[in-house]
């Protein structure tokens, strides 16, 4: 026998994605490819795409959590751009991060300046006179 073939060799382990190794939903491999193709640097370390994917996943989860709360407050089961807008603009840190971002179909925050509100008069004094 010449020793060819796979009779005695170890079976190769099932391939495991870098996303699953890191416990992430966002694609680490795709982020790595985009970092390489984007001409951000000549070389990209192995940890950089994992870290960036984790940050993106966290920010997405945070925004979706707040948008889901906004949708529930409006008695809706589907998140629409309006809910994203309300979630981002009502959160101080997200509003600072995404301050220059325009969300299509997002609308504006409801805001009436105090000067424009009707003056509060004492209705009890007016009725007694």
UniProtKB/Swiss-Prot annotation:
For this UniProt record, the keywords arranged alphabetically read as follows: Acetylation, Chromosome, DNA-binding, Hydroxylation, Isopeptide bond, Methylation, Nucleosome core, Nucleus, Phosphoprotein, Ubl conjugation
Q: Which residues carry this modification: N6-acetyllysine?
A: 6
Tell me where in this chain the PTM N-acetylserine is found: 2
The cross-link Glycyl lysine isopeptide (Lys-Gly) (interchain with G-Cter in ubiquitin) sits at: 14, 16, 120
Question: Which SMART domains does this chain map to?
Answer: H2A (SM00414)
- Key word Nucleus present: yes
Q: Which domain of life is it from?
A: Eukaryota
**Could you tell me which residues carry N6-lactoyllysine?**
10
Q: State the protein's name.
A: Histone H2A
What organism does this protein naturally occur in? Answer: Cairina moschata (Muscovy duck)
């Amino acid at each position: 026998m010449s020793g060819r073939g796979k009779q005695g060799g170890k079976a190769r382990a099932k391939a495991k994605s870098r996303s699953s190794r890191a416990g992430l939903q966002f694609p680490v491999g795709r982020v790595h490819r985009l970092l390489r193709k984007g001409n951000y640097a000549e070389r990209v370390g192995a940890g950089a795409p994992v870290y960036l994917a984790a940050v993106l996943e966290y920010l997405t989860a945070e925004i979706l959590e707040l948008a889901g709360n906004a949708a529930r407050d409006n008695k809706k089961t589907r998140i629409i751009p309006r809910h994203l807008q309300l979630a981002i603009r009502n959160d101080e840190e997200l509003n600072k991060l995404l301050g220059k971002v325009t969300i299509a179909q997002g609308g504006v925050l409801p805001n009436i300046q105090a000067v424009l509100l009707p003056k509060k008069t004492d209705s009890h004094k007016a009725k007694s006179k």
